[in-house]
Amino acid sequence: MNEQLQLIKSSIKSIPNHPKEGIIFRDITSLIEVPEAFQATVDLIVGNYKNQGITKVVGTESRGFIFGAPVALALGLPFVLVRKPRKLPRETISQSYQLEYGEDTLEMHVDSVKAGDNVLIIDDLLATGGTVDATIKLIKRLGGDVKHAAFVINLPELGGEERLRSLGVEPFTLVNFEGH
């Protein structure tokens, strides 16, 4: 593991039994409190997607905003928000998806993505891939194309990478953590 990735991984705190017993929460707020680690995170994602023909960057609520906005800015691209219901002011489309215990919904503005857009999705963590799957569906319903998704953290045993590849999306992750 190179020096930048070591810095990133060591800056992420692991909180046992949060938000419930048996879960190890990977806290990226500790990463963004270390400017060198935050910068390295953005730089590595930007470096992977320069000259890839990306036309828009989409970040999912809420931690995807933290990393997606600076990546979009560094690439000179528009940044699009995907949010929980009733948080966006203009006309939206919505997509429901399954959680471990229930269902949730994401929304985006109907005019945020257009036919022909080549979209990069960014979020902080890839677990099962449910959130990013719903985000992909929103983008495709608006005519956009998604071939890439970037994450700071991957929990490989939860199968998110395989799920994305089955959807034709190549995941890019910076650090893996075992256990969840």
Swiss-Prot record:
GO CC annotations, alphabetized: cytosol
Keyword vocabulary terms for this entry: Cytoplasm, Glycosyltransferase, Purine salvage, Transferase
PROSITE patterns xref list: PUR_PYR_PR_TRANSFER
Gene3D superfamilies in UniProt: 3.40.50.2020
Stretches assigned to coiled coil: none
GO biological process: adenine salvage; AMP salvage; purine ribonucleoside salvage
Principal cellular location given in the protein's record: cytoplasm
Subunit details: Homodimer.
UniProt-listed PANTHER family: ADENINE PHOSPHORIBOSYLTRANSFERASE, PHOSPHORIBOSYLTRANSFERASE DOMAIN-CONTAINING PROTEIN
Described purpose of this protein according to its UniProt entry: Catalyzes a salvage reaction resulting in the formation of AMP, that is energically less costly than de novo synthesis.
Full protein name: Adenine phosphoribosyltransferase
Source organism of this protein record: Mannheimia succiniciproducens (strain KCTC 0769BP / MBEL55E)
